[in-house]
From Swiss-Prot:
Cofactor comment text: May bind 1 zinc ion per subunit.
Binding positions (ATP): 85, 103-107, 492
Cofactor(s) required for function per UniProt: Zn(2+)
Keyword Ribonucleoprotein: no
Biological source species: Bacillus cereus (strain ATCC 14579 / DSM 31 / CCUG 7414 / JCM 2152 / NBRC 15305 / NCIMB 9373 / NCTC 2599 / NRRL B-3711)
Protein name: Protein translocase subunit SecA
InterPro entries given in the database record: Helicase_ATP-bd, Helicase_C-like, P-loop_NTPase, SEC_C_motif, SecA, SecA_CS, SecA_DEAD, SecA_motor_DEAD
Compartments where located: Cell membrane; Cytoplasm
Membrane topology qualifier: Peripheral membrane protein
Pfam families attached to this UniProt entry: P-loop_SecA (PF21090), SEC-C (PF02810), SecA_DEAD (PF07517), SecA_PP_bind (PF01043), SecA_SW (PF07516)
A GO term, aspect molecular function: metal ion binding
Residues involved in Zn(2+) binding: 819, 821, 830-831
Domain of life: Bacteria
């Protein structure tokens, strides 16, 4: 009865039935596709593209396109996709996850939806976990796509920008998940649209989707650079600030805590540092350091805002009076205070750009994936990525023997039993794969086998270079392979002809905290209907057993007088282990979900900044945008200085000083003129004067150069402020969980404070751009420059050394090359004229 109900209500079964009908349609088309010549078969691609332009959809083309790919695969690769592979292809095309067991031909399955979706010309990304697999699949499956007239590209870390652009321009691009994410970040740090490599993200198929979207979900991709805050500059700025006098060299507004140099102060700085114009773009860093030095000396007070403890500056929480250890002021203020107090100035590395795989892959119009094990994480895929997991039936029934776990009292007893089992199977010639959780376990078993005289291969992080060769040999007679955490996914273990009747034996030395990893190990045996056996050996001293109350069981084994050589084989124990694994999986899912909620705050901000950066990059004239920024800056300044209810308390002098110092020239705006106006009327005459000055500035140089100058300023300011903001958000995130002690929801606080910080950053960007546009002297040979040269850092989740990938740098411009400013002239006759 239960079986019947299960069939009626089984959603997966319903999906399979629905797809079976489409498979029958594809089969029916075979008789008309098979007689076609190679040229006629290739011609189908053009026909499909034309039909798409006339209004048909890819869904309409699916049966015929799949039939064409099946026939082409038979001719080019000598492989004909089975019906279950067609089902897998349909599930992928619909934006779902195809769970297909090991050896069922996932790579061939992917060619069906890849071809269909590549017909749109928008690009399809096939994502793999490492470059070896990307190259293998691109060369093998690429033959099929190229036969059908589509272009195939491969995107590798070592490639130049031009090679990457070519790879992404292809109809189908094979790449690793890391490289896709880093290219996205680098594109959004670029200064010229010609430097960008990616097209809009259309459709991705992720191989081993659980590994990328679940196991690596919490690992952010980071491009970081040494923060260009030389400690030396802090020392110089600090020494200079000590010589300044209040009122004469700087003005301090107690209410707004705003401190800035006066004209005298600016002149003093220019003399002290032997420069002509403090507001020149070349001196951005110097001005920033002086301003932060001023804030450190005038605004920040020892034992009120911070304390000096054990040679470190520790912030004091203004609300609770508690010390906030580990928190640092952003934008270099912390280093300025360190210089003021004479303690060691810490040089921070700065995150220039960051994104998690969760957020990167959610940007695709359509996303799908394939793996042998995804059903256990179905809830996560559905809730976070909006993908259903469809379990595709195997082509032949699975006849593998999955035996119940054997539980030993101690680790020693367990390993002795494992080695004995391996030796016995090795004598019979049966190939054995031993799965371990840690590298040290694999090396311990290796030593024990060496003592017994059993030849074997070890596959772990230390020798992954030979991964493919070791896996290829693992199915031959008498082979013994020890693999850590199922390294070598993506390559099948093919059985030698002389062991086809016994199959592969898989031995697990302990249960992983995730059932999925155990299932991956099991799935190595019994591929494509082959025989095979799987057996897990556990001990009461294993981490999972220790964490989830095995004391009772240990006591029971003692009472029964069981020694190390006697295991217990019990369904009850297996169930207890499985429920422990479910609990751990639940905890991990909650952690990933929480990470996503926090990361979403930065995601929304990142999308706003990157979208505006893109607009700036593609825009020919930023004048309108900059005028809008000036208007906002003036309105904010007016509001700040006239916020008191009583007119006499308005700080009109402060407003005039601010405008003359930052935006206008002395005498452009007079105090008595503004006093006659209401606050809402003050902005208009100021903005008119600003535009007048802007027009004068434009007349001083050619139009092209003015436009490039605007872009230089906007990029420099936006990128500097954005990287500082990411840094500040990092620091906010580190300490936010402590708010929970005050009965406050940390996530809500993070969202609110993050939004306030973002608004403050936008205001700061607008103000600084306005100031540089109005005050900076313009040089003839302006060039856009990256704020910081970054390098890609992908923190390794398994504690190995972090992988570092350099940002691809642009080529040097030759004197006879076209100028990068977009003028159409040769470099020597344009921006290179002065050099």
């Amino acid at each position: 009865m239960i079986g019947i109900l299960k069939k009626v209500f089984d959603v997966n079964q319903r999906q399979i039935k629905r797809m079976q009908k489409t498979v029958e349609q594809i089969d029916a088309l075979e008789s008309s596709i098979k007689p076609l010549t190679d040229e006629q078969l290739k011609g189908k691609t053009l026909e499909f593209k034309e039909r798409l332009t006339k209004g048909e959809t890819v869904d309409d083309l699916l049966p015929e396109a799949f039939a064409v790919v099946r026939e082409a695969a038979t001719r080019v690769l000598g492989m004909r996709p089975y019906g279950v592979q067609l089902m897998g292809g349909i599930a992928l095309h619909e934006g779902n996850i195809s769970e297909m067991k090991t050896g069922e031909g996932k790579t061939l399955t992917s060619t069906l939806p890849v071809y269909l979706n590549a017909l749109t010309g928008k690009g399809v990304h096939v994502v793999t976990v490492n470059e070896y697999l990307a190259q293998r699949d691109a060369s093998e499956m690429g033959q099929l796509h190229e036969f059908l007239g589509l272009t195939v590209g491969i995107n590798l870390n070592s490639m130049s920008r031009e090679e990457k652009q070519e790879a992404y321009a292809a109809d189908i691009t094979y790449s690793t998940n890391n490289e896709l994410g880093f290219d996205y970040l680098r594109d959004n740090m670029g200064l010229y649209k010609e430097e960008c490599v990616q097209r809009p993200l259309h459709f991705a198929i992720i191989d081993e989707v659980d590994s990328i979207l679940v196991d690596e979900a919490r690992t952010p991709l980071i491009i970081s650079g040494q923060a260009q805050k030389s400690t030396e500059l802090y020392m110089f700025a600090n020494a200079f600030v000590r010589t300044l006098e209040n009122e004469k060299d700087y003005s301090f507004d107690v209410k707004t805590k705003n401190v800035m140099l006066t004209e005298d102060g600016i002149t003093k700085a220019e003399k002290a540092f032997h420069i002509e114009n403090l507001f020149d773009l070349k001196h951005v860093a110097l001005l920033h350091h002086i301003n932060q030095g001023l804030r450190a000396h005038v605004v920040m007070h020892r034992d009120t805002d911070y304390v000096v403890q054990e040679g470190e500056i520790v912030i004091v929480d203004q609300f609770t009076g508690r010390l906030m250890k580990g928190r640092r002021y952003s934008e270099g203020l912390h280093q300025a205070i360190e210089a003021k107090e004479g303690v060691e100035i810490q040089n921070e590395s700065m995150t220039l750009a960051t994104i998690t795989f969760q957020n990167y892959f959610r940007m695709y119009e359509k996303l799908s994936g394939m793996t042998g094990t995804a059903k256990t994480e179905e809830e996560e895929f559905r809730n976070i990525y909006n993908m259903n997991v469809i379990v595709i039936p195997t082509n032949k029934p699975i006849i593998r023997d999955d035996r119940a776990d054997l539980i030993f009292k101690s680790m020693e007893g367990k390993f002795n039993a494992v080695v004995e089992d391996i030796v016995n199977r090795h004598k019979k010639g049966q190939p054995v794969l031993v799965g371990t959780v840690a590298i040290e376990t694999s090396e311990l078993i290796s030593k024990m086998l060496t003592r017994k005289g059993v030849r074997h291969n070890i596959l772990n992080a230390k020798n992954h270079a030979r991964e493919a060769d070791i896996i290829a040999e693992a199915g031959i007679k008498g082979a013994v392979t020890i693999a850590t955490n199922m390294a070598g996914r993506g390559t099948d273990i093919k059985l030698g002809d002389d062991v086809k009747n016994v199959g592969l034996a898989v031995i697990g030395t302990e249960r992983h905290e995730s059932r999925r990893i155990d299932n991956q190990l099991r799935g190595r045996a019994g591929r494509q209907g082959d025989p095979g056996v799987t057996q897990f050996y556990l001990s009461m001293e294993d981490e999972l057993m220790r964490r989830f109350g095995s004391d009772n069981m240990k006591a029971m084994m003692d009472r029964l007088g069981m020694d190390d050589s006697q295991p217990i084989e019990s369904k009850m124990v297996s169930r207890a282990v499985e429920s422990a694994q479910k609990r751990v999986e639940g905890n991990n899912y909650d952690a990933r979900k929480q990470l996503l909620q926090y990361d979403d705050v930065l995601r929304q901000q990142r999308e706003v900044i990157y979208k505006q950066r893109q607009e700036v990059m593609e825009s020919d004239n930023l004048r309108g945008i900059i005028e809008g920024m000036m208007k906002s800056t003036v309105e904010r300044a007016v509001a700040l200085h006239t916020q008191e209810e009583i007119e006499e308390d308005w700080n009109i002098k402060g407003l005039v000083d601010y405008l003359n110092t930052n935006l206008l020239q002395d005498g452009d705006v007079k105090e008595e003129e503004l006093r006659r106006l209401a606050p809402e009327e003050m902005s208009e005459p100021i903005i008119e004067k600003l535009i007048e000055r802007y027009n004068e500035k434009e007349k001083l140089m050619p139009e092209e150069q003015m436009r490039e100058f605007e872009k230089v300023v906007v990029f420099r300011v936006v990128d500097t402020k954005w990287t500082e903001h990411i840094d500040a958000m990092d620091h906010l995130r580190e300490g936010i969980h402590l708010r929970a002690y005050g009965q406050i929801d940390p996530l809500r606080e993070y969202q609110m404070e993050g939004f306030a910080m973002f608004e403050s950053m936008v205001a700061s960007i607008e103000e600084e751009i306005s100031r540089y546009i109005m005050k900076a002297e313009i040089e003839q040979n302006l060039e856009r420059q990256e704020v910081v040269q970054g390098e890609a850092v992908h923190p390794s989740s398994d504690g190995e050394e972090a992988k570092k990938k350099p940002v691809v740098k642009g080529d040097q411009v030759g004197r006879n090359d076209l100028c990068k400013c977009g003028s159409g002239k040769k470099y020597k006759n344009c921006c290179g004229i002065v050099q």
